[in-house]
């Protein structure tokens, strides 16, 4: 069951990743080439000791903020895709995502928007995505970068802790299972 959960998650993440890449290649983002070149120059300058690490961080933060602000529409679309796929699809299909269907498992429990949202705070970083979009409008530059880095670190920590819980607990429950009251079960085979 552990391997099936991991496999289903990987299938789902790959599918969502492909959709996000397609969107990012279809929707134009302003100044991307210029900002990427600027980031490369900054990296070279810090590696050659031409600027201090503090100046590098400050300039990096400005570039990151501008890039994310210019791509907020794409970030919003990506967040919407995650919400639809990991919240709406399991409600409509009574517990399935494509990955879960392929490997023969599904969600069981009270499948509603709130419970699936709670579950996806841990597994997909949905809250981190939403908060990052909000931060674009309420902060800027170094504050924006610092807060999004902290959110990202917390998200990675949640995923790692939850993965170890699923690996080593006898009931296979991770943080997401406990806070959402939704469990992952094997589909009974019809004979």
Mark where each language-model region is.
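Short, small/hydrophobic-residue-rich motifs at membrane-helix boundaries and re-entrant hairpins
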Residues: 1-143, 147-165, 172-191
């Amino acid at each position: 069951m552990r391997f099936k959960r991991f496999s289903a998650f990987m299938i789902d993440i790959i599918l969502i990743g492909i959709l996000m890449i397609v969107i990012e290649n279809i929707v134009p983002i302003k100044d991307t080439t210029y900002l990427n070149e600027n980031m490369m120059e900054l990296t070279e300058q810090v590696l050659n000791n031409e600027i201090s690490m503090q100046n590098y961080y400050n300039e990096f933060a400005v570039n990151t903020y501008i890039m994310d602000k210019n791509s907020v529409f794409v970030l919003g679309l990506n967040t919407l895709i995650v919400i639809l796929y990991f919240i709406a699809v399991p409600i409509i299909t009574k517990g399935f995502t494509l990955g879960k269907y392929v490997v023969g498992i599904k969600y069981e429990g009270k499948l509603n928007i709130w419970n699936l949202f709670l579950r996806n705070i841990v597994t997909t970083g949905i809250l981190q995505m939403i908060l990052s979009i909000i931060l674009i409008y309420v902060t800027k530059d170094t504050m924006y970068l610092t807060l999004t880095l902290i959110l990202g670190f917390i998200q990675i920590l949640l995923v790692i802790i939850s993965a170890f819980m699923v690996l080593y607990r006898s009931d296979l429950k991770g943080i997401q299972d406990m806070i959402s009251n939704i469990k992952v079960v094997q589909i009974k085979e019809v004979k």
